[in-house]
């Protein structure tokens, strides 16, 4: 994932992996995306020449989903989650 502010893709970079309590410190007011990848094969990925598209190095099938999250004084808010709890259109 990535930070979101005045422009769409900003720091910090939010990695697809990590160890608990070793990453970025988050605090109220931060807004960023979480973009997990689920791969049929290994976790290794590469970015294509367009600078955007991520593919698995072993060419296995992969799916990616994105949520935009805001950190609040009391926790977090998922901005891209359906208010009605729907998982498919109409949201």
Regions found by a protein language model. Give the residues of each.
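Short, basic/aromatic beta-hairpin or loop at an interaction surface
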Residues: 1-14
């Amino acid at each position: 994932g990535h930070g979101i502010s005045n422009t769409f893709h900003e720091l910090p970079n939010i990695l697809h992996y990590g160890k608990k309590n070793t990453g970025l410190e988050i605090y109220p007011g931060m807004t960023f995306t979480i973009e997990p990848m689920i791969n049929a094969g290994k976790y290794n990925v590469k970015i294509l020449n367009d600078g955007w598209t991520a593919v698995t190095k072993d060419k296995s099938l992969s799916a990616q989903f994105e949520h935009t999250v805001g950190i609040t004084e009391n926790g977090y808010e998922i901005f891209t989650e359906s208010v009605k709890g729907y998982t498919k259109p109409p949201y």
